[in-house]
């Protein structure tokens, strides 16, 4: 106590020798942990010589946290660098080859394959090509339209109208003719000029009819053939051409 009081007195003397103090005086009789000063009760202060207990606790707390983090890091490094061992049937430990170790990605992939359901896609048979498959699908979806078949008995030739034979009576052939119509020059049924000239020449009676020729007027009625003709008659090389306007008939001997 004497030393403490003497120290306080010395400090009081040194402070009294200094000029007037402008700092406010805090009259406290307990220790101030924040400023580190001890009040003497008379307005004078003294520096603390010892670290307060709260500061020591704070330092220990942070030190313990730092040491625990460092120990954890060292343990992890040692664990990772330690060789992988596995027990054998004899109880001894043997090293595992690095190739046999399963990586994390492979392990995750195996777990996913085991949990996710396997979806199977339908396989297309190799025999059926894509084009054949498309045609089969179209045949199944589109309605089948059947075309009516023409019977084989009806041939085109049977449908053609037959031309009347020469044995039929001539009157029935010429009865279908109509009255001749005036044809325009250059039309389809127009007669060429040289045929008209020959027709005009033949229509004229011969000037001198020889008596040696047969007289058709004196022939019996059974041998005569009288046919009503409505149209132009052309005789060329023993062939009779009858132009009835709409139709033309050719009679050969």
Curated annotation (Swiss-Prot):
Q: Which UniProt keywords apply?
A: Host membrane, Membrane, Transmembrane, Transmembrane helix
Acidic residues bias located where?
200-216
Please note every region of biased composition (Low complexity): 141-158
Q: Where primarily located?
A: host cell
Which Gene Ontology cellular-component terms appear in the entry? host cell membrane; membrane
Q: Annotated region Disordered: where?
A: 141-225
Per the UniProt record, which residue ranges are transmembrane? 62-78
Q: How does it sit in the membrane?
A: Single-pass membrane protein
List the subcellular locations: Host membrane
Tell me where on the tree of life, at the top rank, the source sits: Viruses
What is the protein named? Uncharacterized protein 037L
Species, as recorded: Invertebrate iridescent virus 3
